[in-house]
Each structure stands twice: as structure tokens, then as C-alpha cells.
């Protein structure tokens, strides 16, 4: 039996899943704080769930890199400006790239324990607003010494335990599983093609709430706002998907000499937020609310930091072992494409057919907004199960430092 955390949920459902567009960093959303992006997604999620803010009994929110000076209050502000009562507590959750999945796990746990019947989940990230930071400035700088300001976004990709960065962990997996540059580029090209098709068909638009210039108010508190720049009136479309033939990707230089990972076959840097309401199933049924899917189980595991990207494989294996399902029972997988080689290594380790994986494109094509990714993937998965009429799906991601996390969800209409 695999080791790690496993939880099963008897009657927990997800509603109103939604996200903002995923927009390339330094793009149209780059000046907006993750808090305001989170508020935007939260308000729309509650609306799509057929609820009001007063119906929410818990706020669970995640944000990795501070994008503003009020980040400490991120979950609280998201709740207040989404109309959640002031008496309702809010919690900041952090499991790096697994944060969005962890929000679902914690919500299920709270509901199963009887702490609440309803929870609002919000993940938001501004890669653009990652700070340039120094951690030793309060004690002063010596005359003539180098000032230690560094790019938080770049430095956070380094794992000081094994002494390597995240791209190098993918290179380790490429060597371990015999994955070639050609395979990685082909996988990336496919991801782009699937995302473009999903965009052109209107599928992705169904989970997007356009970002517009607007004001958010909370009674008795200072108003917040989003103001788009220039002549923009709305941002409604993911910006990164584009057809990317293998021949074009093959021309890009590898990040590390002799390696397989490039800027074209790794996850895109984007700014975005995603939100979902999670409730007790009986609560939703009694009120006739539009359920997207049942959250059936969650798993979390640890793996060696130097091959952190393999994390989804043991997390998914644990999920299947403890739930009594087989790999073949799962119709759709959404596994975060942190790096192309990393995702291919997970598929090879599991023996997973690629035609069931990220069928609407993945993070290589769409982007990886850290704390928002798990919510985005799980919402996309629920919508894809509904569209295809399939029953079971798993969403999953690797986690920097060496972890894996996975969620099992069920389309109740196909049960």
C-alpha cells in the first residue's frame, strides 16, 4: 500500500467554478493585485453557484508570492468584498503549486467534520507582481558591498536542499525515464493545439469571467477596484495559447545545455484567479443548486525533492488504491504541466494513455498561476466530465520541494 495522506468524502460537491482569463505576465492583468483578481473570481463563483455571500460559512484562499502589501489579509479581504459575512472566518492555505487542490481537501474536511456546510475557495496569483526582494536589509549594508536584492519569482524556483532549480528536476526525470527533447516538444505542441481547439470551440470561455474595470464595495470599509489600462474595456480570453508546430519549438534553446526543457515546452507564466464553492451535498440538493461534480477523495504524498515532478504518480496511485478504482476507470486526467518532461514522466510511471490527459490543453499552453492552478484544473475537469458524459476524473500536480497532490471527482449525472 502506498504511503501518504488519503481522505474520502461521503457527500461533498462543487458548484460555481470559474476563473479569470489566464494572461501572460507583464500583460493586461499585470498591474492588478492578486487580491482584486481573487475578489473578482469569488463574486462570480458565488453568483454561478446560485448563492449569495451570506450563504458562505468558511473562506479558504491561497496565494503564493506577495503581490501587494496587504497580502497577509488576502483571504479575509477576498471574503469581505465577495459579500461573505464579517463573522465568517478565513484561512490562507499554502502548498505551493498544490495550493488550489489543498483548498478542496480542506473544504471537504471542514464539511465532513460538521464545521460548515459551505465554503468559498479562491486561488489567485500575479506572476507579474512578484517582488524584487532583500531579506537582510534591516541590519544595513556594508560600504561597497553588493546589495542583496533578488527577483523573488526566479529565486523561488531554486530548491536549496538538493541545490537545483525546478527545470533541473524535470531534466532529472527526463534522464530517469529516457524522455527525449523530441518527445517533450511533441507533447508541448499537442498541448498548444488542444488549448487552441478548446478556445475556438468556446469550451474555455464557459469557465471564464471577463475582467472589467469595476469597483468592489464592502459595507463600512474602503472600496477596492480594478481599472484596466489604456483603451481596454474587458479582458476575456486566455492570451498564451497559439499553434506551435514541433519544428518551431525545436528551434528554441534548452534552458540547460544538452537538456530537453525550453521556454516553449514548460508552463507559461500568467496572472489569474480561480474560485469555486464547495458544499455538503444535502445542502445543494435541498436548495436545487447546480452541482458541477462530487469531490470524492484527496491524496497527498512526499517524493524526493530532486525529482519533485514525479509527485502526481504516487498521489494518483494512492488515490486509486484507497478508493478501489483502477486506472482504466478514470476517463479524464488533468495533471499540471509544470514542465513537459515532468508530465511525460508521470504518464510513463503510471502507464497513462495521453489521449485521456489534459484534453483541453495544459499549463504549457494555458499557463500555471501557482495558487490558482489547482482550482482551475479541477473546475476544467468537472466541466469536461459533464461535456463528455464521463463519470470519474482526477486532477493533480507536483509540488516544489517534493510532493504530489491529487483529487478524485465524480460526475453525478454519469453515475
Locate each region found by the language model:
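Conserved active-site "lid/cap" helical segment
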Residues: 2-78, 82, 86-89, 97, ...
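Active-site-proximal alpha-helical scaffold in enzymes
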Residues: 94-125, 174-203, 275-282, 347-348, ...
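Conserved catalytic cysteine-centered active-site region
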Residues: 63-119, 149, 160-166, 243-268, ...
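Active-site pocket-lining segment
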Residues: 168-171, 204-207, 214, 296-365
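N-terminal extracellular/periplasmic Venus flytrap/periplasmic-binding protein-like
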Residues: 19-20, 31-32, 39, 183-286, ...
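Condensing-enzyme catalytic core mediating Claisen C-C bond formation in acyl metabolism
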Residues: 2-34, 44, 175-176, 244-310, ...
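Flexible glycine-/small-residue-enriched beta->alpha junction loops
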Residues: 117-172
Amino acid at each position: 500500500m502506498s504511503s501518504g495522506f488519503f481522505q474520502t468524502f461521503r457527500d461533498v460537491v462543487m458548484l460555481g467554478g470559474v476563473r479569470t482569463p489566464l494572461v501572460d505576465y507583464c500583460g493586461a492583468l499585470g498591474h492588478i493585485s492578486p487580491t482584486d483578481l481573487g475578489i473578482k473570481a469569488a463574486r462570480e463563483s458565488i453568483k454561478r453557484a446560485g448563492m449569495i455571500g451570506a450563504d458562505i460559512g468558511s473562506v479558504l484562499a491561497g496565494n503564493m508570492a506577495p503581490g501587494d502589501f496587504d497580502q497577509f489579509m488576502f483571504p479575509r479581504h477576498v471574503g469581505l468584498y465577495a459579500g461573505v459575512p464579517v463573522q465568517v472566518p478565513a484561512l490562507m492555505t499554502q502548498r505551493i503549486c498544490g495550493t488550489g487542490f489543498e483548498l478542496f481537501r480542506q473544504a471537504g474536511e471542514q464539511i465532513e467534520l460538521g464545521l460548515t456546510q459551505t465554503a468559498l475557495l479562491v486561488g489567485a496569483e500575479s506572476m507579474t507582481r512578484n517582488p524584487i526582494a532583500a531579506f537582510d536589509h534591516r541590519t544595513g549594508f556594508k560600504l561597497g558591498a553588493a546589495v542583496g536584492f533578488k527577483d523573488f519569482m526566479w529565486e523561488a524556483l531554486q530548491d536549496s536542499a538538493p541545490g537545483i532549480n525546478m527545470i533541473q528536476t524535470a531534466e532529472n526525470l527526463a534522464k530517469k525515464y529516457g524522455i527525449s527533447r523530441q518527445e517533450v516538444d511533441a507533447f508541448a505542441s499537442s498541448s498548444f493545439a488542444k488549448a487552441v481547439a478548446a478556445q475556438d470551440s468556446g469550451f474555455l470561455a464557459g469557465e471564464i469571467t471577463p475582467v472589467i474595470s469595476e469597483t468592489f464595495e464592502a459595507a463600512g470599509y474602503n472600496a477596492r477596484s480594478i481599472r484596466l489600462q489604456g483603451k481596454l474595456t474587458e479582458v476575456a480570453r486566455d492570451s498564451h495559447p497559439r499553434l506551435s508546430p514541433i519544428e518551431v519549438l525545436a528551434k528554441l534553446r534548452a534552458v540547460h545545455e544538452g537538456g530537453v526543457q525550453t521556454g516553449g515546452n514548460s508552463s507559461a507564466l500568467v496572472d489569474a484567479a480561480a474560485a469555486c464553492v464547495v458544499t455538503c451535498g444535502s445542502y445543494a440538493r435541498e436548495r436545487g443548486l447546480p452541482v458541477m461534480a462530487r469531490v470524492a477523495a484527496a491524496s497527498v504524498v512526499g517524493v524526493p525533492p530532486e525529482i519533485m515532478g514525479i509527485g502526481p504518480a504516487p498521489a494518483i496511485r494512492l488515490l486509486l488504491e484507497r478508493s478501489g478504482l483502477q486506472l482504466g476507470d478514470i476517463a479524464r486526467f488533468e495533471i499540471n504541466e509544470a514542465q513537459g518532461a515532468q508530465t511525460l514522466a508521470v504518464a510513463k510511471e503510471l502507464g497513462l494513455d495521453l489521449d485521456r490527459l489534459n484534453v483541453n490543453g495544459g499549463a504549457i499552453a494555458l499557463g500555471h498561476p501557482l495558487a490558482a492552478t489547482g482550482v482551475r484544473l479541477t473546475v476544467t475537469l468537472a466541466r469536461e466530465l459533464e461535456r463528455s458524459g464521463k463519470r470519474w476524473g482526477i486532477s493533480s500536480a507536483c509540488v516544489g520541494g517534493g510532493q504530489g497532490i491529487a483529487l478524485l471527482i465524480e460526475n453525478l449525472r454519469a453515475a
